[in-house]
Swiss-Prot record:
The keyword Ligase does not apply. This is Gigaxonin. Probable cytoskeletal component that directly or indirectly plays an important role in neurofilament architecture. May act as a substrate-specific adapter of an E3 ubiquitin-protein ligase complex which mediates the ubiquitination and subsequent proteasomal degradation of target proteins. Controls degradation of TBCB. Controls degradation of MAP1B and MAP1S, and is critical for neuronal maintenance and survival. One of its GO terms (cellular component) is Cul3-RING ubiquitin ligase complex. It is found in: Cytoplasm; Cytoplasm, Cytoskeleton. Residues 134-236 form the BACK domain. Disruption phenotype: Mice have a relatively normal life span. However, they display deterioration in motor function with onset varying from 6 to 10 months as well as abnormalities in non-neuronal tissues. The prominent pathological features include limb weakness, muscular atrophy, axonal degeneration, neurofilament accumulation, an abnormal microtubule network, mitochondrial swelling and thinned myelin sheaths. Pathway: Protein modification; protein ubiquitination. Its main location: cytoplasm.
Amino acid sequence: MAEGSAVSDPQHAARLLRALSSFREEARFCDAHLVLDGEEIPVQKNILAAASPYIRTKLNYNPPKDDGSTYKIELEGISVMVMREILDYIFSGQIRLNEDTIQDVVQAADLLLLTDLKTLCCEFLEGCIAAENCIGIRDFALHYCLHHVHYLATEYLETHFRDVSSTEEFLELSPQKLKEVISLEKLNVGNERYVFEAVIRWIAHDVEMRKVHMKDVMSALWVSGLDSSYLREQMLNEPLVREIVKECSNIPLSQPQQGEAMLASFKPRGYSECIVTIGGEERVSRKPTAAMRCMCPLYDPNRQLWIELAPLSMPRINHGVLSAEGFLFVLGGQDENKQTLSSGEKYDPDANTWTALPPMHEARHNFGIVEIDGMLYILGGEDGDRELISMECYDIYSKTWTKQPDLTMVRKIGCYAAMKKKIYAMGGGSYGKLFESVECYDPRTQQWTAICPLKERRFGAVACGVAMELYVFGGVRSREDIQGSEMVTCKSEFYHDEFKRWIYLNDQNLCIPASSSFVYGAVPIGASIYVIGDLDTGTNYDYVREFKRSTGTWHHTKPLLPSDLRRTGCAALRIANCKLFRLQLQQGLFRIRVHSP
């Protein structure tokens, strides 16, 4: 008998769920009752067990009896109203969330182990984060293991501390929680006086009750950053400040230290968005390297020097590099012996140390790597013998790898980026043919969809996603106007999700269209994208160029001299200013002028 062809009805599952949902109103189709706050809701056991591992476990450990009695499932901590909303979600996949109910829905989804619903709640909470609630959302997310939401709320708190410190939520913090907040190294304040003033406002909010905590709270202040003349001025005008300074012996009123003593005690708040380069090979010897460096284009325009960071545990080339949730991840690639690797490492910028990661399912190099909400997606590449179309995903919190649907085609040295929680695969080649095609992968549906192709086919390009935009830089292709194998650098392109088409960027000040140019990475920081590579300008080589998205123009970025390394991995990483300052001091990158007495 012939095997035939598999056919499917895309509406089958939706129709079936609608029919099952209609049965909820008919007692003859319900075989159990949920009991909440003394009220009973008729349900269908098999549907509920299929949706909730928690309910399934209760049924397994306490199976229904054959005596004809109605099976009852008691649930505590969930209101009847919220449970009805969740039952509607189970049958429809839709739920209405708002700021009044989100906490109750998260608690219920957590109890019932409804992972998909919890994910929807996380996305809703991400859009709610503001100065007025970020501390509360941060604590709530930590309690319910909403890791990505906790990271975003912490990042918001660090970035917008001055706004947060003026809110009612901040003024109502407990002494212990206040100490935790003002101890954060990356508070973006510019001057410690703003942290000091925030603590003063907190104490003044309930002076009588909080005086007893005054000394303990002030111990978390970074007093080395307070100016003594500012403190004396505040003492003249504010009786509460006089009392605090008198009570707290750690607050300085003497003249500030000078020279080496000042540098030794100085501890700047805040953070810098750094360009980080990792691995690659030495330019002259072509020997793979484990070196890691960072440069802070927005930290100090007059001192944009490369700072040495802790090296990898082993040299890597053709590896994948990505920053996610405040850490840096390096995966795969090849070692000094050209052996393709499955291993990976995670860098902690607070400790300046590396730790090993669980290995990938497949060793690979020249692959794509993107991140969505704390999940690292590894796409394609090569294993030394063959070109790969496999994809796997690493959860950075559970530290586990899972296989994902394959790519639809080989994209040798293609480029990849994430935008609006979707993955885009662009260009690349196979068996001597280059592609301009672009595909989009939605992790929710686990489906690939073709979108508008690039204007130029290319391989060896780099890409990044920013908000609703995709950018593709560099890559090469063969010249079409001559016979032979001469290669040219492709023009950069831009795609907006609203317009659904690619547009050329003006690359006049990036590099000339010669095969001698090669792009290693594109790093979005603030309103700019920094492109790193061997950029042939026609008169010399640049290593980093800044693309300002608002004007569509290219600009020089120090250092202008070419690096001693090439083919490095690149990423953006937020690093505490106090950590950078110590590293710069240790590496002799600061020059201070000490005035003679």
